[in-house]
Amino acid sequence: VTTPRERDETSEVLDDHLVRQVVPARGQPYEHRCPRAAFEQIAHAAEELGEQGFTLESLLEYERTAGRDVTFTNVAVALAFLRERSILDVRYRRNHAATTSVHLDAMTEYHALAENG
């Protein structure tokens, strides 16, 4: 049984931003951006929360409670990239650290993407 594709998603680094590009099966392509500084902060938070597990919303609340200015879109873009690169696993609808060094692995993948595409 062949299922129709829902969408194609790619990531790249442009102008010091992680860019998530989406081409849906129907509708117009779109993209969302996450500045490098926000990505790095989100990676730190994911490392801090990764053992207990977290949702997009709980990470966003964690960051805002700490007085850091990140947006829902920033968190969504960063988490999608971290899951795509197997730095986070999803279990029971919660993100969990898949590595012992989430921040280091996240930044390594970010810079590798920036250099190599």
Q: Locations of the language-model features?
A:
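Long, low-complexity, charged/polar intrinsically disordered regions in eukaryotic proteins
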Residues: 1-44
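Short basic-aromatic helix/loop recognition motifs at nucleic-acid
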Residues: 30, 43-51, 77
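Short acidic, hydrophobic short linear motifs in intrinsically disordered regions
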Residues: 49-66
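Short beta-rich binding modules
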Residues: 60-64, 76, 105-107
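Short amphipathic alpha-helical interaction segments
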Residues: 67-84
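A short, conserved structural fragment
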Residues: 83-94
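Minor-groove-contacting beta-hairpin "wing" of winged helix-turn-helix DNA-binding domains
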Residues: 94-102
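Short, amphipathic alpha-helical interaction segments positioned at domain boundaries
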Residues: 102-117
